[in-house]
Every structure is written in structure tokens, then in C-alpha cells.
Amino acid sequence: MLTDHTIKFNKLLTPFSFLYGIGVRFRNQLFDWKVLRTERYDLPIICVGNLTVGGTGKTPHTEYIIRLIKDRYRVAVLSRGYKRKTSGFLLADQRSTSKDIGDEPYQMKRKFPDILVAVDADRRRGIRNLLALPENKRPDVIVLDDAFQHRYVAPTLNILLTDCHRLYTQDRLLPAGRLREPMDGARRADVIIVTKCESCIQPIDFRIIEEDIHLSAYQELYFSRILYGELEPVFSGKAPRRTLKGLASTTEVLLVSGIASPAPLEKEIHKYTEHVTSLIFPDHHAFDRHDIQKIQTAFKRLTSTSKLIIITEKDAARLRDLPSLPMEWFSHLYCLPITVGFCMDREKQFQELIVKHIDTRIKNHPILR
């Protein structure tokens, strides 16, 4: 069963969660009462977000949608650009770094160089700037990354993600739990995806969770799981091709991660070698020379003649920008890409939902083309 585990809360912080909840509920009511104005747009706007802080898989799901539609439409991704060193609206180009636009937008621009990637904390301003582009560059569809709480923009399709190991229905408001807003905010979602499922999901899990989240008639429920790709050299051409399946049982791996939920990645690598040393940093950690020294010290402690460093794609974005990395890393440093797949043979149904939504919106507003 998917949710057979215990979620820990800080009970001492419960009074603060109560006060936080009052503020968030009042803000949501202001939007519901139309005191705060929500902007609507003619073109398709797909929001991918969640109710919680921490990793639910927004980036791989956003990339899944990009991969699905990029050859059919002109696609733009608009993100806040979390922890970037710039401000205001910025349209990414091939010279942009993770410091300029943030880890996730940088990763998406590297993977999909032909799409538009923009960052702006003010999503309305960001959309206005994208729609002000020349007609041959103007997007047909905008994907909003992590904007479920940004209610100043009304998406035409709202996709809500929830980790199967920590459903929002079982969580509590910040700071005692991880909820950004009360769970009834899920009513704004058109699609709910239960993420990070095990490959052995059973139909009974679908029914239990469907009842647990009280799915509304207008909502669709999907389950997805993480799919790991092949190891990729962080510095192209500097390291030999390697695969997880090809690792010898004696291979030693130093796993370096600065993401919200590193446990699934650790579990995956342990399938191929027992010799895994983990260095865990906070989510979106800005690596500095002291961290590099710490990683180098840990790497030198590995005694096998077959050893490598594995990092996530997001961490690779930050490490690439650092000067003076140890030379020996260039032939030992790999990142492990991830994608998502849908469970219970519903992948085609999800794809059709996305494409039909976009086609319908564009057909109803042909001027967009």
C-alpha cells in the first residue's frame, strides 16, 4: 500500500501553523471574493504546482509536458527562478547561467534549447512580456512552473502534484508540517497526480487514495513514477560513457545531492552497488570552495580503482558554474537524469488530455496562431 508509513510533525509549532492558516485562508478568500484580481488570458496556460514545500517532482513533470508538446506548438516556460541572483523579467538564452535564472529554468533551457524559458516572480508581468514578443516568437502555450499559489494568474489547466509518501491530505500547515496552504486549495486543481509511486502500484491503491483526497467530479487522478536515465558526463567528452547497470559490484560511488528528497536516488543507486557514500546538502544549495573541498576529501577516501561521483541534474547546473574544480573530477563526474512515467496504463490518456486542452483553446482563439 502506497501510504503505509508515518509522517512526523513538529507539534510544538502547531500554534504557529494555526496563525499561518488564518493568514493564508484570508488571502484565498480575497481572491474568491474578487477583492484581489485574477488575470485571465486567451492562450493555453498550464500550471504545474503543489500544496507543499519540498520535492513532489515538479521539474520532471514540467519537462514531460514540454517534451510532449514542443514539436506541435511554440512553448514557453515561465518560472519564478528560485534563488537566482537577478531580479525582474529575464528571457533565457544560451549564455544564461543557473545564477541568472535559477537551477530548474537553467536545466530546462539546456535540455530544450529551442523553447522559450523565462523567469519572473511576477507571473502577470512575465506573461505580458512573453506575449509582447514578435509574432514569430510569441508562444502558443505557456507552462507555469510552481505557480499553484500564484493566484493573480488563472491557468486554463491546473495540475497539482502530491508525493505518494506524503499526501497533502495527511499533512499539516507550515511550520508544523509542509503545507503552503490548507488542503481545500486542491479544489482549484483540474488534474491531480500522485507522484513517486513504486512500480508495484496496485488498483486498490488508486481507489484508496481517490477516496482519501475526495476527488471532485471535474478532477482527474493520475499516478506517476520516477524513471532513471543513463549516466551522463557533467563535462561532455571528458568522461567515458557509463551506465548504472554496467557498474561493477566493487565500484564505489560518492553521491552528492542538494535536492529536497534524495532518498529515492540513493535507493536507485544501491540497486547496482553496495558501496555508496552520500553527501547530502540542502535543497538548492549554492556550492562554494569549502563544499568542493569537502567533496574532494570524501572522494579521495574511496579506495577502489573504480570510483565515480554521481550528482543530480540540478546540482550539475550549479557545479558547472564553479571555477577551479579538481581536474580529476572531469573524468569521474556524472549526473543521473530522471523522467516520469504514468502508472496503470494511463499515459496515453494523460497525453491526450494535455493536447486536447491546448488544441481546444487555440481553436477557440485562432488569432493566437
Curated annotation (Swiss-Prot):
Entry keyword Kinase: yes
One Gene Ontology term, aspect cellular component: plasma membrane
Pathway connected to this protein: Glycolipid biosynthesis; lipid IV(A) biosynthesis; lipid IV(A) from (3R)-3-hydroxytetradecanoyl-[acyl-carrier-protein] and UDP-N-acetyl-alpha-D-glucosamine: step 6/6
GO biological process: lipid A biosynthetic process; lipopolysaccharide core region biosynthetic process
Amino acids binding ATP: 52-59
Protein family according to the UniProt entry: Belongs to the LpxK family.
Function: Transfers the gamma-phosphate of ATP to the 4'-position of a tetraacyldisaccharide 1-phosphate intermediate (termed DS-1-P) to form tetraacyldisaccharide 1,4'-bis-phosphate (lipid IVA).
Protein name in the entry: Tetraacyldisaccharide 4'-kinase
Gene source species: Parabacteroides distasonis (strain ATCC 8503 / DSM 20701 / CIP 104284 / JCM 5825 / NCTC 11152)
